[in-house]
Amino acid sequence: MQSQESGVHYSRWDSSSRDEVSMTAMSSSEEASCYRRISQKLCSGKLGIAMKVLGGVALFWIIFILGYITGYYVHKCK
């Protein structure tokens, strides 16, 4: 099975006066394949490990700041 790419293909026949123009579009399964390829690149190998570490550090700081703000207002002296 051949994968089809989006685009226009123009073919001119020498033996007759017919010209052939064919147009193809990317199917949804090929779009999913593109997203899967990007996901595979970002989530595996050294880049994937770096992304997970950065995501974990960012999540830690978000939770830390939310906890700090919440604790400030809960334990605020009246």
UniProtKB/Swiss-Prot annotation:
Chain positions found as N-acetylmethionine: 1
Ranges of biased composition (kind: Basic and acidic residues): 11-21
GO cellular component terms attached to this protein's record: cell surface; plasma membrane
Residue ranges annotated as Extracellular topological domain: 70-78
Localization per record: Cell membrane
Family membership: Belongs to the SMIM1 family.
GO molecular function: protein homodimerization activity
Entries under Pfam families matching the protein: DUF4731 (PF15875)
Cytoplasmic side: 1-48
Positions of transmembrane segments: 49-69
Name by which UniProt lists this protein: Small integral membrane protein 1
Domain of life: Eukaryota
Species for this entry: Mus musculus
Subunit description: Homooligomer; disulfide-linked.
Role noted for this protein: Regulator of red blood cell formation.
Membrane topology of this protein: Single-pass type II membrane protein
Region (Disordered) location: 1-22
Keyword terms: Acetylation, Cell membrane, Disulfide bond, Membrane, Phosphoprotein, Signal-anchor, Transmembrane, Transmembrane helix
